[in-house]
């Protein structure tokens, strides 16, 4: 993938459905906020910034309302996006050789980030065909070295939002595992797509049911501005004080040691502005429905997402590598599921423009209509930078 896609990336003639990148101009409100916050109000405006108290207090209040949990400002660590939040979480919870459970298909950066933290990924599969959490598989994967289970909701790449019953059962099995092995198994709830939900779909954070939860969040998704790095790592306010305090005590030093994982001054000043902004959910819904209908008609199996801006679909019968190349031959690029260890599927990002999606649709039909492929070039499975 990386060679063919890399050669064409940015070419106006292609239909780029790979990553969650913008294909239209940024939100006007974002531009205005950054312009206004760039104007210094005092001499320390651009001095070193950690987690600013004003930002922490604002976010604690917003999270109290959004997640119905009594967050305090000290529970919020501002980070340079969810990447940094996740890496900090790995380092404050895991020691060298500790294990973390991942449910696949999964975001392809979890595994290398765990390895970089000297931790050991333990992989289980989501349940087919709806890609729900396989709680039995998760429980079986937890062993004496397991310190962390990672859950991503809404889920990339499938768009699934896990329901309350599933999350309650997950909390119960984590309690059992913690008792069984005599140490706490933490939960990382990765929630960067939390506000990107369709048709009024509700959302419950796993932190509602399991006190030993850390929440990672990024503004890059709701703003469709992944190049402006800001997010946070939130510690559940339900976590017992002793453990909460222990994590808080190492948070600053870990963020510093990992390369100053604090957002820049302008982004922190802009937090109240960012909270009121969103990309056009109605447009995303329209693109989702258009793609899902067209692909289903063309013979693909499509999982309609509850959230995110991705469509997860199964290739028709045949060689997935061949199908991917046939789309690329028609100037359409998607993310192969092999990057997420699920070869028979692929992911479409519908952050693409309406015109780009409209141009891409005939190619999907052509791939299923003609079983003979003119292209047998292999897919290279090194992901480009992106999500």
Predicted regions and their residues:
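PLP-dependent enzyme catalytic core of the Aspartate aminotransferase-like
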Residues: 65, 139, 326-335, 339-387
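N-terminal small-domain helix-loop-helix segment of the aminotransferase-like
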Residues: 1-81, 88, 274-278, 371, ...
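Short beta-strand
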Residues: 14-16, 216, 301-307, 338-339
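Conserved core segment of the aminotransferase class I/II
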Residues: 211-285, 368
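Alpha-helix termini
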Residues: 5-8, 66-68, 173-184, 237-244
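Conserved glycine-rich beta-strand-loop-beta hairpin in the small C-terminal domain of fold type I
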Residues: 265-272, 284-295, 302-314, 340, ...
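Conserved core of the PLP fold type I
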Residues: 43-179, 194-209, 357, 376-386
């Amino acid at each position: 993938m990386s060679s063919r896609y890399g050669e064409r990336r940015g070419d106006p003639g292609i239909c780029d459905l790979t990553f969650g990148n913008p294909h239209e101009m940024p939100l006007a409100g974002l531009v205005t906020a950054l312009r206004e916050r760039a104007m210094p109000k005092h001499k320390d405006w651009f001095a070193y910034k950690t987690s600013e108290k004003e930002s922490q207090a604002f976010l604690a209040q917003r999270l109290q309302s959004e997640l119905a949990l009594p967050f305090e400002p000290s529970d919020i660590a501002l980070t340079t996006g969810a990447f940094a939040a996740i890496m900090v979480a790995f380092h404050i919870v895991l020691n060298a050789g500790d294990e973390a459970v991942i449910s696949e298909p999964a975001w392809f950066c979890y595994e290398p980030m765990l390895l970089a933290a000297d931790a050991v990924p333990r992989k289980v599969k989501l349940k087919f065909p709806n890609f729900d959490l396989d709680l039995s598989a998760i429980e079986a994967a937890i062993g004496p070295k397991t310190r962390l289970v990672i859950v991503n909701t809404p889920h990339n790449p499938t768009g699934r939002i896990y329901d309350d019953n599933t999350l309650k059962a997950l909390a119960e099995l984590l309690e059992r595992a913690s008792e069984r092995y005599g140490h706490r198994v933490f939960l990382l709830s990765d929630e960067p797509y939390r506000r990107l939900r369709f048709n009024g779909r509700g959302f419950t954070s796993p932190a509602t049911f399991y006190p030993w939860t850390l929440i990672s969040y990024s503004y890059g998704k709701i703003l469709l501005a992944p190049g402006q790095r800001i997010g946070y790592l939130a510690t559940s306010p339900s976590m017992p004080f002793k453990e909460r305090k222990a994590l808080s005590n190492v948070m600053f030093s870990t963020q510093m040691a990992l390369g100053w994982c604090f957002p820049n001054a302008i982004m922190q000043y802009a937090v109240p502005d960012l909270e009121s902004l969103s990309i056009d959910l109605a447009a995303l819904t329209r693109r989702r429905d258009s793609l899902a209908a067209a692909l289903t008609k063309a013979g693909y199996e499509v999982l309609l997402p509850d959230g995110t801006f991705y469509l997860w679909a199964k290739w028709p019968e045949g060689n997935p590598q061949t199908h991917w190349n046939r789309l690329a031959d028609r100037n359409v690029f998607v993310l192969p599921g092999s990057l997420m260890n699920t070869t028979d599927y692929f992911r479409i990002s519908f952050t693409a423009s309406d015109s780009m999606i409209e141009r891409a649709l005939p190619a999907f039909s052509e791939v299923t209509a003609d079983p003979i492929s003119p292209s047998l070039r292999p897919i290279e499975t090194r992901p480009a930078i992106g999500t």
